[in-house]
Regions:
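Hydrophobic residues in well-ordered beta-strands that form the structural core
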Residues: 59, 82, 88, 110-112
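Conserved PLP phosphate-binding loop immediately N-terminal to the Schiff-base lysine helix
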Residues: 89-91, 120
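Predominantly a Rossmann-like dinucleotide-binding segment in NAD(P)-dependent oxidoreductases
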Residues: 106-111, 116-176
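N-terminal glycine-/serine-/threonine-rich beta1-alpha1-beta2 phosphate-ribose binding loop
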Residues: 1-78, 91-107
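Extracytoplasmic "Venus flytrap"/periplasmic binding protein-like
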Residues: 77-79, 132-133
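Proline- and acidic/polar-enriched loop/turn elements at helix boundaries
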Residues: 10, 63, 85-86, 93, ...
Length: 177
């Protein structure tokens, strides 16, 4: 449709370049990927510049930062898609709930990336179960097998803050573990 990717932001420039390359490889020579050099924002306040440049915001940052990025987006009347989890602690959860209420009052759309909830195979399976295709379910177990979570090795001269931000999955201040 009439959607164009116009800006990206990250605390680290190499992450923008790697992500942009992946998007371009996935979508090919798509004209709707229109991120000029001036719209590649780097730094701790980069999210503000990217949000200011857009109509709809996609928040895929480490979840420890997400409540504050969400707050900025809603306060600036932006529609938001954000990945799960939406926060990492009670303070962040309260912030997200508060901003979700404001978003609703402003009639802004907010969607959380619960990918399996929207995947057609899962939706079809749920319908079949609800319609009794396998009878009454008395119990069940679900497993999710994966190769594991990435680890970025510490680089020489890297600060503790940068190391933790690049390995956010393993640190409670920016993760959900």
């Amino acid at each position: 449709p009439d959607v164009e990717l116009v800006a990206m932001a990250d605390a680290f420039s190499d992450r923008i370049e790697k992500s942009l390359k992946g998007i371009q490889e996935h979508f090919g020579d798509e004209k709707k990927i229109n991120i000029k050099e001036k719209n590649r924002f780097v730094g701790f306040d980069a999210y503000k510049k990217a949000i200011d440049s857009a109509d709809v915001v996609i928040l895929t940052t480490p979840p420890g930062f997400r409540p504050y990025h969400f707050e900025y987006a809603i306060n600036n009347d932006k529609h938001v898609f954000m990945e799960k989890p939406v926060a990492t602690d009670p303070v962040g959860v309260r912030k997200v709930l508060e901003m979700a209420k404001i978003a609703k009052e402003k009639k802004l759309n907010v969607v959380v990336g619960l990918q399996r909830h929207y995947q057609s195979k899962y939706i079809d399976l749920k319908k079949r179960i609800d319609n009794g295709a396998i009878g009454k379910i008395r119990s069940g177990q679900v497993y999710w097998n994966d190769a594991g979570v990435w680890v970025k090795k510490r680089k020489a001269g890297q600060s503790e803050l940068e190391y933790q931000m690049r390995n956010w999955y393993y640190f409670n201040s920016v993760s959900y573990t």
